[in-house]
Amino acid sequence: DAKDLGVDMFLLDDGWFANKYPRKDDRAGLGDWEPTRSKLPGGIPALTKAAEEAGVKFGLWIEPEMVNPKSELYEKHRNWVIELPNRETYYYRHQLVLDLSNPEVQDYVYGVVDRLMTENPNIVYFKWDCNSPITNIYSPYQKANQGNLYIEYVRGLYKVLDRIQAKYPKLEMMLC
């Protein structure tokens, strides 16, 4: 029994998401934040229920600032990616950074957490990962204002985190 061993939380880490391009390694799925039906037929609700029945809390890994080129999000919103035009793209861990200077991207990233929390109110913790530095420095949104990209990116991230904290003040998050 997990609780008898001193376990107080079950954290579902990387690999639980995406259906068109299911996450099986670091080459696909980032950006498509729905449970992989073939891996989790009961979705996240079945896991939160099992955790509750075991007397432990439930946490979830996400990396919402990133996207794999092999994802539905990238196919639909390539213009949301920080990427130099007319240059060969550099991939760090087969992923790219979403442009959080763009309010549409901020809404999307907030929506990832909001949807997961709405559908799974028993989530008490997010491990918010960020496994790539910003490379390919160019924002389609900033256009002529490229010199402010880093600053506007961080401001955008803070706006997202402020919105999450305002709606879910008891939700714990570790940003790493």
What residues fall within each predicted segment?
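Active-site-proximal structural scaffolding
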Residues: 3, 40, 44, 51, ...
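Conserved N-terminal glycine/acidic-rich loop preference
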Residues: 84-90, 94-95, 101-105, 113-116, ...
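Short, loop-centered acidic/histidine patches that primarily coordinate divalent metals
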Residues: 15, 131, 176
